[in-house]
């Protein structure tokens, strides 16, 4: 864990958040998209910001570094930007909830369905190998799931691009499982 005193905010770009397991294998956690808080703020009453994960830029990005003490003094203590900060923190909480679902609750089909619904653009821009790595499933499993979803007329695949045909059916695969 690194200790910081500045909040980091991704103005634009894309960041991958990951950790290493005991065998030095990279474990993908989630992506941070433009206009999102990067820092992991766990307590607004302290002046310390902890970093529990590794991060790497996936594309050219712009990051804003904000002195947390000055942010508190000039804005938060005067009830300015509190709603925006809360919104960013809730977004991070939702990312962590999605991570728990992906790793502990969802089966392979639910993992794929969730990614298709929540980030179809990312899914279509990545190589299938990278998608399977992110979802922690084998490439062969990803291929089988996509074929099944296609057979069930839930998705269509044209030129390696997934097109959602039945979003209600796709959502029903993972909703109710723990969302």
Task: Give, region by region, the residue ranges found by the protein language model.
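Regulatory nucleotide-sensing modules
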Residues: 1-12
């Amino acid at each position: 864990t690194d200790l910081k005193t500045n909040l980091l905010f991704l103005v634009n770009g894309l960041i991958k958040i990951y950790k290493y397991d005991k065998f030095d294998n990279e474990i993908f956690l989630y992506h941070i998209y433009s206009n999102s808080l990067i820092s992991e703020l766990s307590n607004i009453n302290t002046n310390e910001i902890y970093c529990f994960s590794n991060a790497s830029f996936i594309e050219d990005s712009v990051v804003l570094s904000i002195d947390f003490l000055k942010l508190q003094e000039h804005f938060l203590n005067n009830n300015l930007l509190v709603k925006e900060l809360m919104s960013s923190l809730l977004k991070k909480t939702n990312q962590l909830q999605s991570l728990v679902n992906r790793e502990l609750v969802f089966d392979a089909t639910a993992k794929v369905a969730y990614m298709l619904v929540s980030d179809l653009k990312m899914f279509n821009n990545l190589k299938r190998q990278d998608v399977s790595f992110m979802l922690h499933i084998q490439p062969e499993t990803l291929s089988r799931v996509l074929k099944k979803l296609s057979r069930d007329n839930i998705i269509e695949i044209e030129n390696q691009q997934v097109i959602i045909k039945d979003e209600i059916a796709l959502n029903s695969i993972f909703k109710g499982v723990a969302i």
